[in-house]
Amino acid sequence: MGKIGIVFFASLLFLLIIFPSCAFAAITRASPLSIGQTLSSPNGTYELGFFSPNNSRNQYVGIWFKNITPRVVVWVANRDKPVTNNAANLTINSNGSLILVEREQNVVWSIGETFSSNELRAELLENGNLVLIDGVSERNLWESFEHLGDTMLLESSVMYDVPNNKKRVLSSWKNPTDPSPGEFVAELTTQVPPQGFIMRGSRPYWRGGPWARVRFTGIPEMDGSHVSKFDISQDVAAGTGSLTYSLERRNSNLSYTTLTSAGSLKIIWNNGSGWVTDLEAPVSSCDVYNTCGPFGLCIRSNPPKCECLKGFVPKSDEEWNKRNWTGGCMRRTNLSCDVNSSATAQANNGDIFDIVANVKPPDFYEYLSLINEEDCQQRCLGNCSCTAFSYIEQIGCLVWNRELVDVMQFVAGGETLSIRLASSELAGSNRVKIIVASIVSISVFMILVFASYWYWRYKAKQNDSNPIPLETSQDAWREQLKPQDVNFFDMQTILTITNNFSMENKLGQGGFGPVYKGNLQDGKEIAIKRLSSTSGQGLEEFMNEIILISKLQHRNLVRLLGCCIEGEEKLLIYEFMANKSLNTFIFDSTKKLELDWPKRFEIIQGIACGLLYLHRDSCLRVVHRDMKVSNILLDEEMNPKISDFGLARMFQGTQHQANTRRVVGTLGYMSPEYAWTGMFSEKSDIYAFGVLLLEIITGKRISSFTIGEEGKTLLEFAWDSWCESGGSDLLDQDISSSGSESEVARCVQIGLLCIQQQAGDRPNIAQVMSMLTTTMDLPKPKQPVFAMQVQESDSESKTMYSVNNITQTAIVGR
């Protein structure tokens, strides 16, 4: 290479070092930004340049997160008018304005303002804000944060300024490939306290509820468990207000709030592995504004449903029956409205208040400042126009002087709303309650009489035939259980390590009795199950559990460490499970978030592994007979362990099924043939596994899930969902972002196969394992039976049936 070539190469290398990757620090009159060039923030978090949505021919100037794929655009300059050729510049013109021009100097976009300074430059700040700066005073003359598109970043805000007629909102894209303004706008209202709204054109689409210092009352998910935190500053006298948000855990500054073209407001952050949706609204059809019409209550169940508030009836029964609820409801009884101003308003000829819990406060409220809760009620009672009031600790007194619209009830969270009714509504309700209470009292008395008689008969027979009376010494028990190689603990040790069964050591309460935590001398933690005298688990079940668990060892079965029998005390000692039972997670609004879909799928597979061992791989063939979510324990790593073998039965040789005259189990989990004929087999456990599988997917209890006027059960709802959409929409909405649609749909189909009415139509556990771990084609399930309705109680019910006449003879909490 000659000297000239060497000099040229060195010069070129020098220029590349000085001006790398066609990126530079600022836009000036002399240095415009052209297609193919980018402007980066100082630390390289954001980047400004030209882009084409989904590789369309249209070019836009936008800001996005740098070096993150796929590209997330957070601001667009020329969203109304794209550049359609490859010759365009973002520059500062002679009038002192930032403009986008294409061929022949046609102005595509400008900031709409001009400045007289001769030293103007445009920079992209590290917070993602594009600013036009006066180089003389170093003052920001214009900034993109004051002209938002569909996205708000950490240091930007939506706001209103009434005196100056200004409002800063988020405006959705028209569609994912067209950034021009769509039909949705997110804004902050001027009410006191303010609300967040999504408007669809000129009509409300979603409402966040009154602001309560740190949360919107219509978003119960804003419970402090999320990484994002909102803040609203409102100056009522000045007529201004603004909303910003920040990240509580600042291990990442990559976050944005966006309004999608479908009308969904999402707060998204990057946890280092990818983008995660922290909060989203709306998430349910109940969230859509005024779904149930005036004085209608939208129940945020799955799926949502509408009801009239107490004391109200549908305006049109015909429309209501068609599920067209927008007409709402009307009062059944007019208010007396004697302008009462004291507590005597509760008298029969006055008006009263009915309290509705867990609701989003209605729209169109009035804030009454500086009064307490009692005065709030009296102010409403003394005003004939007042239809309801709510006293919210972080707000104060809110009253409503018109129809109640956009009222929603949550499963948990929300506020308390007191609705004004005619006193006759309460009187009628009280009469019904008295009648019901009388019937229940008489029924309970009769049941107790018969139960006492049969219990006396049962105890008399037990005294004649029981091979080991409760009073028998521990030595006799040792002799009886000697072949099982069971460890015996003495009672004094148990009393010491449980601090005399103190409340501090109590882990929980089951139908069998309490469970306590203890620490052995070597520091090992154990769980002690203490059989209570009122438990439905008798001597037979106690012995059964010891004999079975002592012979069964598997990573997905709870391990028995020993027992203690002294006098009437019977105790079982197990390995300690740090996370208690599965039901404490999936049915808890906060804890359920710790079990995303991948973890739930692992738990499902673990339970199936445990059942496979019981049915096929152990030295015994065991039918559990009481598979349910509360009998699945979780260790410190959330590995599932099947527990409670008191009702389990062993099968011998070629035996595949058995019959019992004493049907025991938990309502909702019992297969049809077992509940009504006493016939049980491995397929009985498969049925219960199917129910359990659907509970894990949905996060809903079989014992409390009913929807619609016809009272559909969880199983029926799962069947309808599978028929309509393949079942992928069944996943618990609180963790839906973590789920694989195909995986969820597959598990729903497996669950439906497991709950088939005929035992022969259900797969065995080996087939279930293959279905869960392979991509084999699944058979189509038949419509399951939905005959058995289950009512929720404080504890799950273990039910015993006499199969002679299929009548319930005893119910024992379990």
From Swiss-Prot:
Q: Which residues form the Protein kinase domain?
A: 501-786
The record's EC number reads: 2.7.11.1
Q: Where in the cell is it found?
A: Cell membrane
Question: Residues on the Extracellular side?
Answer: 26-433
Q: Which domain of life is it from?
A: Eukaryota
The Phosphothreonine modification is found at: T660, T809
- Where is the region CaM-binding? 590-607
Reactions this protein catalyses? L-seryl-[protein] + ATP = O-phospho-L-seryl-[protein] + ADP + H(+); L-threonyl-[protein] + ATP = O-phospho-L-threonyl-[protein] + ADP + H(+)
Residues binding ATP: L507, G508, Q509, G510, G511, F512, G513, P514, V515, K529
Query: What are the transmembrane regions?
Result: 434-454
Residue spans, topological domain Cytoplasmic: 455-814
User: Has the keyword ATP-binding been applied to this entry?
Assistant: yes
Provide one Gene Ontology biological process annotation. recognition of pollen
A Pfam family assignment: PAN_2
Recorded topology in the membrane: Single-pass type I membrane protein
Q: Where is the active site?
A: D626
Q: Where is the signal peptide?
A: 1-25
Q: What class does this enzyme belong to in the EC scheme? A: transferase
| Residues bearing attached sugar chains per UniProt | N43, N54, N89, N95, N253, N271, N324, N334, N340, N383
Q: What protein family does this chain belong to?
A: Belongs to the protein kinase superfamily. Ser/Thr protein kinase family.
What is the protein name given in its UniProt record?
Answer: G-type lectin S-receptor-like serine/threonine-protein kinase At1g61370
